[in-house]
């Protein structure tokens, strides 16, 4: 069941870039009911994004760091605990899909982000901070309400 669907949104850097750093092509939210000891409802969100090549390289690096951190976590964590899960597939046309379940966290370069829009924006801000000296406060979002 689709709960929510938004129109195309774009993330720009005010007065700093002539082309958008990334464009949100489409996103939707669905509910998944998980029957356990108690009934749990999770949100599954899929975001399709068109990104430029510079941001793509930074995302590859962040994914690599996150995978290393998760591998270390598995050595010390009990298998019964919630496993962090981020499924990211990147196609040749630089469109990637992030599928995630709410409340699961991932560690990227020692920074905690709750998976969701805060994760996506945090990834952009961290990537921008690491890639250049541009101030992060110049980032703004169009039609993202």
Swiss-Prot record:
Cellular location(s): Membrane
Full protein name: Putative uncharacterized membrane protein YAL026C-A
Chief location category: membrane
Membrane topology classification: Single-pass membrane protein
Organism: Saccharomyces cerevisiae (strain ATCC 204508 / S288c) (Baker's yeast)
Additional record remark: Partially overlaps DRS2 and YAL027W.
GO cellular component, one term: membrane
Keyword Membrane: yes
